[in-house]
Regions:
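An aromatic- and glycine-enriched ligand-binding surface/loop that stacks and positions planar moieties
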Residues: 1-97
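Glycine-centered secondary-structure boundary/capping sites
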Residues: 42, 168-171
Length: 171
């Protein structure tokens, strides 16, 4: 869902568009049209033998509590989190000598090979769009609205169940 081939797919309701061709070298703001948040979320010292991911700066590490909140067979875990031990077991390297190291990084907005600019400052010009509202968010908001307004608990549960069913690939 977070690769560029899925930008503005049926799951996406609202996205902030970014481009890798902004040719910007200006750290003063987002006027460059590139997504500079991506480089910040990537793991430091990352070397990917499959050349999918590239090194980032290691900001905003994922907590162990978030990692552990996922069931082992939940596909959303793999989409959301890079487990550093699993990554190393597959032949990759990631530095653990960083501030606030947890052993986990954000996968969905991790820098990917080929997603940054060849002009301007690379770190400022990633093309990854930011998914602001997804269809699953709408379903969860509908569920919450029903519960908070005294609506049908059963209908609220149905909306929630649709989210889980879709995430598991059954919808």
């Amino acid at each position: 869902l977070f690769d560029d081939e899925y930008e503005w797919c049926k799951e996406s309701v609202f996205e902030v568009n970014y481009t890798e061709i902004g040719n910007s070298n200006d750290w003063a703001g987002k006027a460059n049209q590139g997504n500079s948040d991506i480089i910040m979320l990537g793991a430091r010292g990352l070397k990917d033998p499959n050349n999918v991911y590239v090194e980032g700066w290691g900001f905003a590490p994922v907590t162990k509590a978030l990692n552990d909140a996922f069931l082992p067979d939940d596909p959303r875990k793999w989409t959301t989190i890079i487990d550093h031990e699993e990554f190393r077991a597959e032949g990759g390297t990631i530095s653990s000598d960083v501030n606030q190291y947890t052993g986990y990084s954000v996968r969905k907005y991790h820098p990917r090979a080929g997603y940054s600019s060849t002009v301007g400052t690379e770190a400022l010009n990633y093309k990854n769009n930011y998914r602001v509202i997804r269809f699953s968010d709408i379903l969860l908001m509908a569920s919450e609205a029903l519960l908070r307004s005294g609506g049908s608990v059963g209908e609220a549960q149905d909306y929630y169940a649709r989210v889980v069913k879709r995430a598991m690939g059954d919808d």
